[in-house]
Amino acid sequence: MSSMASVLFAALAISGVQVTPSRGYGCFPQYSQFWGQYSPYFSLEGRSAISSAVPPGCKITFAQSLQRHGARFPTADKSATYSSLIKRIQEDATEFKDEFAFLKDYKYNLGADDLTPFGESQLYDSGINFFQRYHGLTKDSKVFVRSAGSERVVASAHKFVEGFNKAKGSEKGGATKLDLIISEEDRRKNPIAPQGCDAFDNDETADKITDQFRSTFTQPIVDRVNKKLPGANIKIGDIKSLMAMCPFDTVARTPDASKLSPFCHLFSHEEFRHYDYLETLGKFYGHGPGNSFGPAPGIGYVNELIARLTSSPVKDNTTVDHELDDNPKTFPLGLPLYADFSHDNSMTVIFTAMGLFNATKPLSPTKITDPADASGYSASWTVPFGARAYFEKMVCDHSPSAKQEYVRVLLNDRVFPLQDCHTDFLGRCKLDDFINGLTYARSNGNWDQCEVSPPK
């Protein structure tokens, strides 16, 4: 944890505010929880109908986490877009009125692609939280850690292991070697960062839906901004970029993201609700259940989860690399703890293949559907920076049989209501029932329809 973050932590603790790594980012919630996938992870414990605590009389015997990398700078192409937009505004605007005054002398110095220091601290804290929750499984075993090959994902996995080991007391810090890094080269079989489904890649539904929703709220913002920046000639497409600068500038300003970017004050809370929903629509119709091939790339990971839950070989004909998964050194079975690290889009297709969003009805392209009315679906609730999903297996004293095993899924500390198995009042399904419900993945879904000719 950075020195600045440590000072903030101590100050909050002295003031009586509970601060733990599991709470996530709590600053500026009226803004930061409405940044779509660019929201920093915040705990959904308070929005869960079921406590995320281990049920009384139960013991966790297995846990697998799937986590997104921490907060980062914009991707290279978007960083170039944002920089160019700000330069154009500074060259063309004849006045910078009111809250836009800072733009006159603002210097764009955001990097590209890599984690910010705040993003690193997110994953360090995540490692601490993972140890605190599952420390009972660490006595005789280590956590097996895999990462997708992007630098920011690998760096996130390293910070997680660093935090985990620090909490365990086994290391004094420093990057720790990962067990496996899987390349993200084009068409490479990689279940934690899947690709290779042409029909999925060629689907244009998300673009059409997001364009439709953007048209419902953006024009009044354009008119207001152009009054504040006469001569800048701001277009509809520029508004999303200006709004995105709010989260990206905030997570880069300080090591603990404790200073809100002045870009945030350019827009109202209601406008950020629309921004959040715009990003949510992009995920739902681009990588989720709104894309008929949305689940297909996630099949391989679900089949890996089945293998780990049952300590049996992986059965998959989609994105799994069997040279890795048939090798006990690179895909060991029978361990109690696993941690995988990936991207937001990859996690969305995996959750979709698992059927987690089966209760979510198609999202409206014309008006906001609140996450509570979408069975908990939104980009900020499911795949924020540093998102974490836990797949737990447990045994309980009150079970009819001492050998009865249960499965429960937590997504950002919310006990996720499983759809394709019989869920009890604690959010659990019997292991066999859970696996039987994963029929889409076990049958390889519609992967055989992925290979299509590119559109002419």
UniProtKB/Swiss-Prot annotation:
Look up the EC number in the record and give it. Answer: 3.1.3.-, 3.1.3.8
Q: Which SUPFAM superfamilies match?
A: Phosphoglycerate mutase-like
UniProt binding sites for 1D-myo-inositol hexakisphosphate? 37-38, 68-69, 72, 75, 152, 283, 343-344
**Is-annotated flag, keyword Glycoprotein?**
yes
Q: Tell me, what is one Gene Ontology molecular-function annotation carried by this entry? A: acid phosphatase activity
- The residues annotated as the active site are 69
**Use in biotech settings:** Phytic acid is the major storage form of phosphorus in plant seeds and, thus, in seed-based animal feed. Phytases are therefore of considerable economic interest.
Q: List each coiled-coil range.
A: none
Positions bearing carbohydrate = 317, 358
Provide the top EC class: hydrolase
* SS bond partners: 58-396, 197-450, 246-264, 421-429
* TM segment ranges: none
Please name the Gene3D superfamilies in this protein's record: Phosphoglycerate mutase-like
Q: What is its main location?
A: secreted
Signal peptide segment: 1-24
| GO cellular component assignments | extracellular region
The role this protein plays is: Catalyzes the phosphate monoester hydrolysis of phytic acid (myo-inositol hexakisphosphate), which results in the stepwise formation of myo-inositol pentakis-, tetrakis-, tris-, bis-, and monophosphates, as well as the liberation of inorganic phosphate. Myo-inositol 2-monophosphate is the end product.
Q: How does it assemble?
A: Monomer.
Into which family does the record put it?
Answer: Belongs to the histidine acid phosphatase family.
Q: What is this protein called?
A: Phytase A
Q: Which organism is it from?
A: Arthroderma benhamiae (strain ATCC MYA-4681 / CBS 112371)
